[in-house]
Amino acid sequence: MRLPMQKLLIPTLLGLAMFAGSVNAAAPLRPPQGYFAPVEAFKTGDFKNDCDAMPPPYTGSLQFRSKYEGSDKARSTLNVQSEKAFRDSTADITKLEKDTSKRVMQFMRDGRPEQLECTLNWLTSWAKADALMSKDFNHTGKSMRKWALGSMASAYVRLKFSDSHPLANHQQESQLIEAWFNKLADQVVSDWDNLPLEKTNNHSYWAAWSVMATSVATNRRDLFDWAVKEYKVGVNQVDDQGFLPNELKRQQRALSYHNYALPPLSMIASFALVNGVDLRQENNSALKRLGDKVLAGVKDPEIFEKKNGKEQDMKDLKEDMKYAWLEPFCTLYTCAPDVIERKHGMQPFKTFRLGGDLTKVYDPTHEKGNKGS
């Protein structure tokens, strides 16, 4: 007796669907398409090699003063003296972050081997020294660790996935660097995992971004899953009006900190989406709600003043770079024409904590100028 064709097809299609699901779970992690861009040119001839003296690998205690030292629990009043102490004590770490980002951008533009070698030498030296791995840390110290990891790993992703394969002849350095990134990411997970909700704020989102960038750089599905978990915790804190209760506590800096929460969340959602995990609808599209609330607040800060009773400090929000999150955000959601117009007026967005030039990655047709951070 012959079975009808549709009865034969049902289990076959089910099997295919299950197979596709398992393949997706096992597929190597990847970044968004813009990270596959080739090096623009391979320039030759004389040039000024600006590979400075490498900052010495930071292997000391991660006990740093907070720039809000002495402030009340709102952590909203800057302490100029302690901020200077913080900047001084973390200068070598910040130089590594900024110069890695800058040099990767230069290499992707000019293709000079000296630019690549400088970056890899610095990262390899810090990796060999097990830098930034101290177990003696305070809140500011563990914050520096995850910021630095996010900066380095997200810049490195541009090298690793470029269609020009610049790391092909640098296997040994790549292995050392990636092993160090993995150790740092494991420590970041330990530093920030399972915090009580009242202590989960923008810091946790930035920690999750650093772990997401590392997961793609090193193909670690466990790190990817942790970043997704933390993202969900974060966007489930967004209320139905688009506010983050823990950032509203920052008084006159509430709007700034809502804005500061958006870059890591938007990048995580973007990286997750290309790996088959769609987070856009989480908590009724909470990320979209948060982004829209911030854009409305920038236009009319009284929205936030009415919510928490404090006139908002708009100083930070006058810098174009603070809106770099619009690049991934406007690929995840449909941005209104006035938002797109504003985005184009501020481009290119270059920010070292997200790995460099996001306009080059997400909106390359609008790449222009030499702005950057």
UniProtKB/Swiss-Prot annotation:
Q: Which residues form the signal peptide?
A: 1-25
Annotated substrate binding lies at S66, K67, H139, T140, Y257
- Assign the protein's first listed, main location to one coarse class: periplasm
Q: Which GO-annotated molecular functions does the record name?
A: poly(beta-D-mannuronate) lyase activity
Localization annotation: Periplasm
| Any one GO cellular component localisation term in the record | periplasmic space
Keywords, comma-separated and alphabetical: Lyase, Periplasm, Signal
Q: Does the keyword Hydrolase apply?
A: no
* Catalyzed reactions per annotation: Eliminative cleavage of alginate to give oligosaccharides with 4-deoxy-alpha-L-erythro-hex-4-enuronosyl groups at their non-reducing ends and beta-D-mannuronate at their reducing end
GO BP terms, alphabetized: alginic acid catabolic process
What does the record give as EC number? 4.2.2.3
The record's comment on protein family reads: Belongs to the polysaccharide lyase 5 family.
Give a short account of what the protein does.
Catalyzes the depolymerization of alginate by cleaving the beta-1,4 glycosidic bond between two adjacent sugar residues via a beta-elimination mechanism. May serve to degrade mislocalized alginate that is trapped in the periplasmic space.
Q: Per its record, how is this protein called by name?
A: Alginate lyase
Organism of provenance: Pseudomonas fluorescens (strain SBW25)
Q: What gene codes for this chain?
A: algL
